[in-house]
Amino acid sequence: AHGEHLLELGAGAGRNTPRYTGYDKITLLDYSRTQLEQAHAKLGDSPRYKFIAADVYRLPFVDGAFDGATMIRTLHHMSDAPAALAQVRRVLTGDATFILEYANKRNVKSMLRYLLKKQDWSPYTIDPVEYLPLNFDFHPAAIRQWMKDTGFRIERAITVSHFRVGFLKRAVPTGLLAWLDSLAGLTGNLWHLSPSVFIRAAMLDQTPAVQNTTKPTGGLACPACRAELEDTPPEIRCPGCGRAYEVKDG
């Protein structure tokens, strides 16, 4: 995808960030300041990057701030996935592209384990399963419904990690296994049977959630009262509610 300003949700230490060569600017967002400090150390002080420590349920951006977003290896930590997706939609323009990865509960391994009575939760029920604290697997049908309800239209799906089984990793050469995995991923538009699924989505309508006629500037907004903020280090003070947000080491 190509565009002006990408929002990388759950950016962590910036491992994936260099891959997004099609965007002029990238805002890395993560709940962990420590992770963002690692990303900053890796990516440097380039004006192309902005580093924001924030809560995905209260994104600190104006409506329609970005024309692209990614959320990879992140949704599975969300106890309220629809609320998180709604926030993502709010900050995207009408022509944006959204890349989402989710953990699929209805995968072959979980179905076999359920059949053999080695797990007590069903991979077929629509509700998420919390297999560890704040670690969720989701049913594909639930993801499709949530995406539609929050204003996204799924364009393509790719399944990955089909062969996440110990004996296969030991018995089959890594290169061959990766090739077979990429081949199997082409069936993603037909069925989701792998533990991890990538989705490319567009917007259901071609306008932001709230009309925004400006370009995707990545503009900041107070997460408490939604007033627009000026990026004025070393402290950003909200003109609406008076809250102050610290700018520390970039």
What residues fall within each predicted segment?
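Short catalytic micro-motifs in class I SAM-dependent methyltransferases
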Residues: R73-H77
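Conserved class I S-adenosyl-L-methionine
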Residues: F98-S122
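Short cysteine-rich clusters marking metal-coordination/redox-active sites
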Residues: C222-C225, C238
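A conserved beta-strand element that flanks and buttresses the S-adenosyl-L-methionine
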Residues: T70
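Class I SAM-dependent methyltransferase SAM/SAH-binding core
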Residues: L7, A11-R58
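A C-terminal cap/extension of S-adenosyl-L-methionine-dependent methyltransferases
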Residues: K117-D120, Q145, E155-L220
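Acceptor-substrate binding/catalytic loop of class I
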Residues: W121-A142
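A short glycine-rich, Lys/Arg-flanked "PGG" loop and its adjoining helix->strand segment in the class I
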Residues: P82-T97
